[in-house]
């Protein structure tokens, strides 16, 4: 055990899952002064909102006691509602498909939580994210996690240098199977706990039902781009670009897919065939651009990009515009680009940053049917 590390205080965001449990265990084994914090971001007494918070906190307590670290629960419900959930609802009202995990990392896990950790004398915060940080000169690079299937840099694309300088990601160099093995070997209470999936405040519940409690659904026509009415939709907010299931269109031939929305007239556009031309575009405009390093970027640069989590990288050219937005031009047409989702830029394994997809284009024209 290193004696130097005992002078370094690391506050670990513990969710009650195996990843954050192993994170705390590893840091404790390495001799750091470790404190576990459970973030309560959602009111689980609410009739609709469940994050299984009580069970999860019980697991945090069990693991913290096993590895011998102090633990606390901190309430970030107000911050979460104001910064993440309100944004989530506002995006759906606009007919877009938001990514609350990106906003949660930016505003809660690496802002509100980081500030709280610093009030406890933390030198660093650590989480169970599958990502890596590396010091290069005066800057910290954000790198993909070794486990390609679990890499979470897509959701961390908005982190700044000030945030990255304060974080540790002990799992970034591991495969998920290794993490489970460490948990089992250490006898951690969460070793066999199932991974959480989906959006935490929705939990295991039906997404449609959850959303309808906060936003009134407005059913309307489901049409082709040529205007043929094929049925009714339940409310534009329930559908995303490229969606196949839940359309209720029968008949022969290939399946039908959502290709766009007309918010003003409350119309959902659908077309037949996975590779229908209307699903493809060759560029987009992104807003809320943020870079993970402070070094000056050229106005135009070539890199790769992801337009959704776990998607294969696509080669792109990024043209930064005077208004701070970015035009992202694809080397080859891409299917089902979705406004509201994140576009994230990479140079090899380095996550350069990203932004929010705003408008979608093809052959120099904006695809108005997409949004």
Curated annotation (Swiss-Prot):
Residues 99-101 are annotated as: Interaction with target base in tRNA. ATP binds at residues 13-20, 39, 128. It is an enzyme of class 2 (transferase). One of its GO terms (molecular function) is tRNA binding. It holds the Pfam family tRNA_Me_trans_M. Its main location: cytoplasm. This is tRNA-specific 2-thiouridylase MnmA. Disulfide bonds join 104-200.
């Amino acid at each position: 055990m290193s004696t130097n590390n005992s002078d370094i205080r690391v506050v670990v965001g513990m969710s009650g899952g195996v990843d954050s449990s192993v994170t705390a265990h590893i840091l404790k084994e390495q001799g750091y002064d470790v404190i576990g914090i459970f973030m309560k971001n959602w009111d689980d007494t609410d009739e609709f909102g469940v994050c299984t918070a009580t069970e999860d906190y019980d697991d945090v307590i069990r693991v913290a006691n096993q590895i011998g670290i102090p633990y606390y629960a901190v309430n970030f419900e107000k911050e979460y509602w104001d910064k993440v959930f309100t944004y989530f609802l506002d995006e759906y009202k606009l007919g877009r498909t938001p990514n609350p995990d990106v906003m949660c990392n930016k505003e809660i896990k690496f802002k509100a939580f980081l500030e709280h950790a610093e009030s406890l004398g933390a030198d660093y915060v650590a989480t169970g994210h599958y990502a890596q940080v590396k010091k290069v000169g005066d800057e910290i690079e954000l790198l993909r996690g070794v486990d390609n299937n679990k890499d979470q840099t897509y959701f961390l694309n908005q982190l700044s240098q000030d945030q990255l300088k304060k974080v540790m990601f002990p799992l970034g160099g591991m495969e998920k199977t290794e993490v489970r093995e460490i948990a089992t070997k250490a006898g951690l209470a969460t070793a066999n706990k199932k991974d959480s999936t989906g959006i935490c405040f929705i939990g295991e519940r039906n997404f449609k039902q959850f959303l309808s409690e906060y936003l009134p659904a407005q059913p309307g026509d489901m049409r082709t781009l040529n205007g043929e009415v094929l049925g009714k939709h339940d409310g534009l907010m329930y559908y995303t670009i490229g969606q196949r299931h839940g359309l209720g269109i029968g008949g022969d031939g290939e399946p039908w897919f959502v290709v766009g929305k007309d918010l003003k007239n409350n119309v959902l556009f659908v077309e037949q065939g996975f590779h229908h031309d209307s699903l493809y575009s060759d560029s987009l405009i992104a807003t809320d651009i943020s870079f993970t390093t402070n070094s000056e970027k050229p106005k135009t640069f070539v890199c790769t990009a992801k337009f959704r989590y776990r998607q294969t990288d696509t080669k792109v050219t990024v043209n930064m515009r005077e208004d701070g937005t970015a035009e992202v031009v694809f080397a080859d047409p891409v299917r089902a680009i979705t406004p509201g989702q994140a576009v994230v830029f990479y140079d090899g394994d380095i996550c350069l940053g990203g932004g929010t997809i705003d408008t979608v284009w093809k052959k120099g024209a904006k695809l108005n049917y997409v949004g």
